[in-house]
Regions:
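Beta-sheet entry/capping signal
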Residues: 10-12, 51-54, 85, 101-104, ...
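A donor-sugar binding/catalytic signature common to diverse glycosyltransferases
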Residues: 88-136
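Conserved catalytic-core segment of nucleotide-activated headgroup transferases in glycan assembly
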Residues: 1-73
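Nucleotide-activated donor-binding/catalytic signature segment of Leloir-type glycosyltransferases, i.e.
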Residues: 71-88
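Short secondary-structure boundary/capping segments
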Residues: 26-30, 68-72, 103, 119-121, ...
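C-terminal amphipathic helix plus adjacent low-complexity
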Residues: 1-7, 142-181
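Short acidic-hydrophobic, aromatic-tinged amphipathic segments that line or gate anion-handling sites
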Residues: 84-88, 135-147
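Flexible loop/turn segments at secondary-structure boundaries
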Residues: 19-23, 60-65, 93-96, 111-113, ...
Length: 181
């Protein structure tokens, strides 16, 4: 993909709609909002070229035709940072799972969905799945930057973490949404 060295891992950063759930899980611990998280993350990964980075817009960015999102910014920096690319809109999460080695999110569902497929994830803020133990949770800004700097060393997660993610998703997506139970 993108003509990248196939020996390098690929991390996908799953951006949030800028007004999407900023405070749904209480006060944010590291970044004040989705914009700050996205901007700081993109600025940080510029110097980490031992891994390739895909930046994926939240699907609702296209639905709501947001006046501002990070697409223009990422397209602008691609020339100077060939290890960073904007995810084409033609790629969906099912396709992305085939080549992504690490998923990164502030507090989104990719932080639990990708571990269900054995793909490690890095999460920053609290979410509905915080505490189930299937993702790497940043403790503070310094720890988050350390996780990003070592993303190229992350490996497939354990069967126990995969099972935790699968069981959680089954309960959350099937049992809790089934009105017949």
């Amino acid at each position: 993909i993108f003509g990248w060295d196939q020996k390098k891992k690929i991390a996908t950063i799953f951006l949030h709609h800028l007004i999407d759930g900023n405070y749904r899980h209480g006060k944010r611990k590291i970044f004040k909002d989705n914009y700050t998280w996205a901007f700081q993350t993109i600025e940080t990964i510029k110097k980490y070229n031992k891994i390739n980075w895909i930046v994926k817009q939240h699907p609702s960015e296209y639905y709501y035709h947001s006046k501002f999102n990070f697409s223009t910014y990422v397209k602008k920096i691609e020339k100077e940072y060939p290890h960073i690319r904007l995810c084409p809109t033609s790629l969906n999460d099912a396709t992305i799972k085939k080549f992504t080695n690490i998923a990164i999110t502030s507090h989104g569902t990719s932080g639990v969905e990708f571990p269900a497929y054995g793909i490690p994830s890095i999460c920053v803020e609290d979410s509905f799945f915080t505490g189930i133990g299937c993702s790497s949770q940043a403790k503070n800004l310094k720890h988050y930057k350390l996780l990003l700097s070592k993303a190229h060393t992350m490996t497939k997660i354990t069967k126990q973490k995969i099972d935790r993610a699968k069981v959680f998703l089954f309960i959350y997506e099937i049992l809790l949404k089934n009105k017949n139970l």
